[in-house]
Amino acid sequence: IHANSPRNMCDVRIPILYSYDKNADFSEKSIALQIAEAVQIIVQLSRFPDGSRKITAITEVDGLENSGKLRLNDIFLYDRQKKIFHATGNVPKTAIRKIRDHGISVDETIFQINVPKEEIKA
């Protein structure tokens, strides 16, 4: 889905797609609930002025706030100035559990703040 950010995708773009079905009558909360149940991780790919594309955000969808709005937690963000990908300190517990359920180990130290990750090459 083309969107400016993970939040823009969840709050604007997907609800617009729902509105294309004239026979459907979904509330904002029901759309948010469906997104929360179906999407665990959002990967934001951005195009840079030189034409290159890079991952600029990896964001967890972590259920709903009391207000009915989706709870989004950035896990990794790309620093355009330093040209590095860095952890925010948020650990995606649900995603990690699902990965481990498939027998794959996850080193949780990658989620520590101030541990720069290598630049992701597109």
What do the PLM-derived regions correspond to, one by one?
Residues 1-66:
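Conserved P-loop NTPase nucleotide-binding/switch module
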Residues 51-122:
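NTP-binding/hydrolysis catalytic cores, primarily Walker-type P-loop NTPases
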